[in-house]
UniProtKB/Swiss-Prot annotation:
It is found in: Plastid, Chloroplast thylakoid membrane. The keyword Cytoplasm does not apply. The 4 large subunits of the cytochrome b6-f complex are cytochrome b6, subunit IV (17 kDa polypeptide, PetD), cytochrome f and the Rieske protein, while the 4 small subunits are PetG, PetL, PetM and PetN. The complex functions as a dimer. The chain crosses the membrane at residues 4-24. InterPro entries: Cyt_b6/f_cplx_su6. The keyword Lyase does not apply. Component of the cytochrome b6-f complex, which mediates electron transfer between photosystem II (PSII) and photosystem I (PSI), cyclic electron flow around PSI, and state transitions. PetL is important for photoautotrophic growth as well as for electron transfer efficiency and stability of the cytochrome b6-f complex. One of its GO terms (molecular function) is electron transporter, transferring electrons within cytochrome b6/f complex of photosystem II activity. Coiled coil: none annotated. It is a single-pass membrane protein. GO terms for cellular component: chloroplast thylakoid membrane; cytochrome b6f complex. This is Cytochrome b6-f complex subunit 6. Belongs to the PetL family.
Amino acid sequence: MFTVISYLSLLFISFLFALTLFIVLNKIELI
């Protein structure tokens, strides 16, 4: 059970990182 929770949290963190990177790249292109 602990392995599943740690895997899900890692997936969630990587998703947030990708989303932030995507937003930053879009803002750079807009400027």
